[in-house]
Regions:
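Cytosolic regulatory regions of ion transport systems
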Residues: 1-35, 40-586, 622-632, 638
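In a subset of proteins, long, contiguous C-terminal domains/tails are tracked
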Residues: 96, 602, 607-609, 616-646
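Surface-exposed intrinsically disordered loops and tails
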Residues: 378-384, 577-618
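Preference for protein termini
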Residues: 552-556, 592, 600, 646
Length: 646
């Protein structure tokens, strides 16, 4: 008996904890059963079905004082009164109070799901969240849509922080929920009346961030498949460059999809904000200094020299972004290449990984490994482009096997600083994983770097306030923090995407197409969208390379654009044909179609299949070897370049 009672009490407690409505239902059922039982007993005792005396005793214990005047036995009336005291005066009040406490607690913890429609759904609450909310507020103004934020963290803590940041008026449009975005059932509940836009953010420093976001995106595709709903604007944030690499091989587009998707690689976006948009402080329009200073023209003797310390994801992003944009006319006229130096202790393994990742680029590149032995003797290994491909890229690489604090690297940096404005424009990006160590490294560099005003960019993923203060001093005026997570989503990203869409529309116009920018953009796969973004990123660099009149330098800048395009394609994983293969391909395409042999047709089909399947591109060649039709595309791009930044 004791065990049965204990089991009953456990189940009752669990039911009360897990569901507030169940407790109320059980209570009211118990009251009704007791009341009808009492009514039956009353009928047996006095033959009366009237319920009013029973109700009176249940609701008002004071009514027991007049029990002697009633025909019911006093003992029976006492039993009803005691039951009423226990259930109505004590338990019912407690249950109702607990009910409202539970409602409030569920809201605070983010358990309650508001019945939103046509809202903005933000899955995750990483450091980009505040800027996304500011962007929505700025674009929508007083008509700001309802926003639902789903976080796997503490919903109440997040809500309180947002109230402090944005105020109660804005928070009246925002609800914070707790949930896991990668769960299909969770996403189905959140999007039962699907949002008009969804941001897949994730949380800061969460494991398997990209895998969770891509899984969530796949769940969304499943929910939308075959459903007649309005189109959803979707933004997917990725943190790993390998995720972007994989997406390059997907051929899907948004042309007939119910989801319009924009992928943002957070690490690459930090690098583009630093080197392309160059927005140091948005509130006063202060810019980061350009790697190319005021511009590099055909007559310039200087080339860009970017030194990047650390072999980290942000270091790779900064280095490859520089390789995307730093292409100048003086390579055509004087053979001056952009130089990118990567510095790290025990660099061998990371260097091999980096070279393997961009194997097709390094097959055509000049690069070298610089190190010092135990006696301080300098050792240098030089690598040349493979002879079968040719030597035509305008980027060269250095890998330096030493710590930035080592005497050898400090001497080397001092030598580079002495060459600044004479044979190169030196810039330094400190990109280690440890933000505190990055600050220390930036403060104790060779004195000549500060004296010669060499730009020093310091990666600060959390807060940049320490270096902001340092930047305001005379000694450290050339120190610039970058990469703060809160800056990842900002107006500069949208501006770059807009230029990319205009560039794609310009290219389509050259091919005789006339759809609008958004329709054309939807028809592109991830690789082509990325290519257009990279082309847009280089526009400002080209405009700074013009001496007087753009029309006088079209051919020169067209060659510069093709040099940039070569590196872009190689960074994306495309490979070039060998010289022998290029000669064979040119011989086939220069033969009239009617005159081609069967063997030539089969070989041409193999070339085209290799381009689609293996990313082999036959236009990765020196500009002089390019077909006239391909050259015309570069020329028209240059002629219309001002339209892209209107």
């Amino acid at each position: 008996m004791r065990k049965a009672v204990k089991n009953f009490m456990y189940k009752l407690a669990r039911l009360s904890a897990e569901g507030r409505f169940q407790t109320l239902v059980i209570l009211f059922v118990a009251i009704i059963v007791f009341a009808f039982g009492c009514l039956g007993i009353q009928y047996l005792l006095i033959g009366d079905w009237s319920p009013w005396r029973i109700i009176e005793l249940l609701l008002d214990p004071g009514a027991f004082a007049g029990s002697s005047a009633n025909s019911l036995p006093i003992e029976f009336q006492l039993l009803i009164t005691l039951f009423g005291v226990v259930f109505f005066t004590a338990i019912l009040i407690n249950v109702v109070a607990n009910f409202f406490d539970s409602v409030i607690n569920d809201y605070r913890k983010g358990v309650e799901r508001p019945p939103f429609k046509n809202h903005t759904l933000i899955l995750g609450a990483n450091s980009m969240l505040d800027n996304i909310l500011r962007s929505i507020k700025q674009s929508e103004g007083a008509k700001m849509s309802k926003i639902m934020i789903v976080t796997s963290g503490d919903a109440e803590e997040l809500r309180n922080r947002l109230i402090t940041t944005f105020g109660k008026s804005v928070m009246g449009r925002i609800s914070v929920m707790r949930g896991r975005r990668e769960m299909l059932s969770e996403l189905h509940q959140l999007s039962d009346a699907l949002a008009r836009s969804i941001y897949f953010l994730g949380e800061d420093d969460e494991p398997n961030h990209d895998a969770k976001s891509l899984r969530c995106y796949r769940h969304l595709q499943t929910l939308c498949a075959g459903a007649k709903r309005r189109r959803i604007e979707c933004v997917v944030v990725l943190n790993q460059t390998s995720s972007s690499h994989i997406l390059q091989y997907e051929q899907t587009t948004d042309e007939h999809s119910p989801i319009k998707t924009t992928y943002i690689n957070a690490v690459e976006n930090h690098a583009q904000r630093l080197l392309v948009s160059r927005n140091f402080r948005l509130h006063d329009n202060t810019l980061y200094p350009a790697l190319y200073r005021e511009g590099i023209t055909a007559e310039s003797e200087c080339g860009v020299h970017l030194v990047v310390t650390g072999m980290t994801p942000i270091a790779f992003a900064v280095a490859t972004t520089a390789a995307q944009i730093c292409h100048f006319p003086n390579f055509v006229t004087k053979g001056v290449r952009t130089k990118i130096s990567l510095v790290a202790p025990k660099i061998g393994h990371d260097m091999e990984l980096f070279i393997d990742r961009y194997a097709h680029l390094f097959a055509l590149s000049h690069y070298k490994l610089l190190s010092w032995d135990a006696e301080g003797q300098r050792r240098e290994q030089n690598f040349e482009p493979k002879a079968e491909y040719g030597d035509f890229l305008d980027i060269e690489w250095e890998f330096i096997d030493a710590n930035i604090e080592s005497p050898h690297v400090r001497d080397w940096l001092s030598t580079c600083a002495e060459a600044d404005t004479k044979s190169e424009y030196l810039s330094l990006a400190i990109c280690g994983d440890d933000a505190v160590q990055n600050v220390a490294s930036s403060l104790y560099l060779p004195q000549s770097l500060y004296e010669r005003n060499i730009p020093i960019f310091v990666y600060q993923p959390t807060y940049g306030e320490v270096l902001q203060r340092a930047h305001n001093t005379k000694r450290y005026a050339t120190l610039y923090p970058f990469g703060m997570r809160s800056d990842c989503f900002d107006p500069t990203l949208q501006a770059r995407l807009q230029v990319a869409k205009r560039g794609n529309a310009l290219y389509a116009t050259l091919l005789g197409q006339t759809p609008d920018e958004e329709t054309l953009w939807d028809s592109l796969n991830y690789t082509l969208r990325r290519a257009n973004l990279w082309a847009a990123n280089s526009v400002e660099v080209k405009l700074c390379s013009v001496v007087t009149n753009l029309d006088d330098e079209v051919e020169l800048l067209a060659e510069v654009e093709h040099n940039r395009w070569n590196v872009e394609r190689l960074l994306m994983g495309f490979t070039s044909l060998s010289r022998a293969e290029r000669d064979e391909y040119n011989a086939i395409v220069n033969t009239a179609e009617a005159e081609r042999t069967e063997a030539q047709r089969e070989q041409l089909a193999r070339f085209r299949l290799a381009k689609q399947r293996d990313f082999v591109h036959y236009d990765i060649v020196p500009y002089d070897s390019l077909s006239d039709s391909a050259k015309n595309i570069d020329r028209e791009f240059i002629k219309n370049i001002h339209q892209l930044v209107k």
